[in-house]
Structure formats: C-alpha cells, structure tokens
Amino acid sequence: MSRSLKLAAITAALVSTLPAVAQQTTQEGNWMVRARAVNVDTYNGSTPIPSLAVPKDAIHVESKVIPEIDITYFFTKNIAAELILTVPQKHDVKVKQSAIGAFDAGHFYLLPPTLTAQWHFNPDGNFRPYVGAGITYSDFSGDQLHVPGVTRLHLDDSYVGFAVQAGFDYKLTNNLFFNMDIKKAQVRSDLENDAGVKVSRVKVDPILVGVGFGWRF
C-alpha cells in the first residue's frame, strides 16, 4: 500500500472515532452539588395545654429563609440519591393564646439532614423534572423555652420522619444547572416541662421551597 493510501486510511479511521470521542468528553458525571436559598414555611401544629389554657395549634415556630447544600449521586440516568444539608438554624417560638395572654416562649436550634431517593425524568434534555421520597432526621438542640414566671420547657432531642419532594434542574451549560425544589418534611417533637412530663406535641412539618444552582461532575 502506498504512503498516500495509508495516510488516507488512517485519516478515515481517526475521523470515524470522533463522534465516540465527543460523546465521551461531553458525558455527564455521576455527582451533582447544589446550593440553594430555601424558604422554610412552618405548619405550626400543636396539641393543647389545658393547664395553661393554651388551645390547639397556638404554638407557632418561626418561618425563615435558610441556606442549603445538597449532594446528589446518580446511579443511572434516572435514579439518584440526594443528601440535603444545612447548619443548625435558630427558630423563635411564640404562644399566640394562653391564660396569661400571648407571649414569646424562647427559641431552639434545628438541624434536619434529609436523605431522599429520586426519579429524574427527561435526563438527556435541558429541562429535567424529578420527584423524590425519603427520611428527615431532626436534631433539636439549644432550646431556651419557657412559660414566663411558670416553668422552663424542653424539646425531645430528635425525631425521624418522612420527606417528599419535587423539582427540576434546567441545564445552562455542560456542568451548570438552575434548580427549583419543593419539599414537605415531618419535623415533630414532644414539649416537656422541667419534671420531664409531656405537655404538648409540636408539629413543625415545614414546606420548603428552594431556588439555586447545581454543578454536575
């Protein structure tokens, strides 16, 4: 075979591999990290405290906006697991009605890491909706709660509840995505007095709406 024919054959072989090489270089990684700003809208459910004339749902936990980081691993194009993290968040507590009127009951800190299994639709498109379900582990700490002039109050240290979510990623570049996400989480605790007697059940059960960006690698 002449040199020119060999060169033509090699060139043809190299050109034929270009689509596969291009596909490999643009293939998305299994990991995604997102940063979001999340509005925590608390449910504010609670059982009554008859001894203080506190009616049902009169204990209100502050709603607020918090930072959030999540780490997602894609097992396949459609199936993923997401770990949602933040730092302990301070929540003020108010009692809207009681025998001594409305009052500020203090505050507590809440750390609610959440793990969900997800199904991602349209994984090769720019618009990629998903749904998920899993568990939330709520760690309550630093509680400074009280009924003025009557007693101090305490929350149970932890609670494990369900979580569901829906959202979407929108592809901006090969690695960068815009994200919106909504979650509902079970976050609950028993409220006890200094003697360790349960006086109420508090249901924070927030709806969390987040907006942010993700990086896939």
Q: Which ranges hold each PLM region?
A:
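Outer-membrane beta-barrel translocator domains and adjoining extracellular loop/strand segments
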Residues: 45-52, 92-100, 141-150, 190-197
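Cleavable N-terminal export/targeting peptides
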Residues: 1-29
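Membrane-spanning beta-strand positions in outer-membrane beta-barrel proteins
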Residues: 32, 80, 126-128, 171, ...
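Outer-membrane beta-barrel domain signature
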Residues: 56-60, 102-106, 151-155, 198-200
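Predominantly the C-terminal beta-signal and adjacent terminal strand-loop region
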Residues: 90-94, 173-217
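Gram-negative (and chloroplast) outer-membrane scaffold detector with strong preference
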Residues: 39-41, 70-146, 206-216
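Short glycine/proline- and aromatic-enriched beta-strand/turn motifs that initiate or cap beta-hairpins
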Residues: 23-70, 216
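Residues that define the transmembrane beta-barrel architecture of outer-membrane proteins
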Residues: 29, 63-67, 107-113, 127, ...
